[in-house]
Amino acid sequence: NDGKSALYSQTDLELYRTGASPYTHPNVDWQDLLLRNSAPIQQYNLNFSGGGKVARYFVDLNVYNQDGFLKQDNSLNSYNTRENVKKYSLRTNTDIAITDHTQFKVNVFGQMYRETTPGKAIMGSIYRDMYTVPNNAYPVFNPNGTLGATPLYQSNNLYGQAVMSGYYLYPKTDFNIDATLEHYFQGALKGLYASATYSYNSSYREALNRSKGFETWSYWKDPTDPNAMEEYLQMASASSQSNATSYNRLNRMQYLEMAVGYDFNVKKNNFRTKILYAYNDFTASVKNIPLRKNSVGFRAEYDYDKRYLAEFAIAGMNLNTLKPGDQWGIFPSVGAGWNMHKESWFDVAVIDAMKLRASFGINGNDGTGAYYRSSSATLSDYYYTYLKYYKTGDNIYWG
């Protein structure tokens, strides 16, 4: 015994046991009050494919809906406060044989995603409090219908958090498309081929804040005196529903690649060459200056009877984030190899393949940061104000 007075008197314990005074001596089962027995998931999928010699296609449609466990009161709100996720997606793949030696391929993917949560944080507040707030902390409602509270739990009535705190809506969209055109020359130019690829990817993230505060009151009446006065004291005030929107991210990436190659052989001598140009344009958000990369490359490969191998490659890359005059980087490389298992004298039953190879090259790191002090812009309702400051004494080069 620490000599202190008991936290609960015998009268308190009896009132909790009998439930005779639920407003002054509550015993709330928070999980039963707030949670449903299940969280339904519905998913619908439709896909079909077809085509013939000239064209082939595949289409996939998907609808996904998942509800959360929280209960909601449709008589109080015209909107959903329960956690919910809806997703709609479409994917198509199409291959077209323009000629016997010319192929066109296009793939498209689009997705719309909408997540709803209560105005109070689910994991950081509602579900946490549901398992940590004592059952006798406060009544859900007072006798006059107001939300219950105490000086210790002033504004976090769990029912209010789940049902009366408004909601957040998180719309997300993704769109991707890539297309490739390939042609293989014939006749005197057999072995020569050309290809072009273009892709576009975008994603959009938004957060709509429709949360609001709710009013709570503490209540007291002597449970042992039927004629005692009721006492109410306001603990928290209601607030207007927010109408704020934040654009978390709107990024876009474009990629273009064009290549020409020529493969041929003379007896056991095999040659493969390829020239490539690529352009990459990435914008991280509506406020960011696009990051652009141009690259050109050449590669030549040779092998004799697939035994002796040699390769040479060189690439040049240009980044707009580097200092003017230092935006280009040149990166050569060479390599050689020997497939020993191709030799007539190599006869080892337990080894199917053995290869020796060596390579040397110079590479670069394009993740060294930007030469510009700021690669973003200030966004107002109607215009952009770009920041044009440069670093001084802190040049950035190819790393």
Where are these regions (language model features)?
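A subset of solvent-exposed loop/turn segments in beta-rich extracellular surface proteins, enriched
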Residues: 5-26, 137-158, 216-229
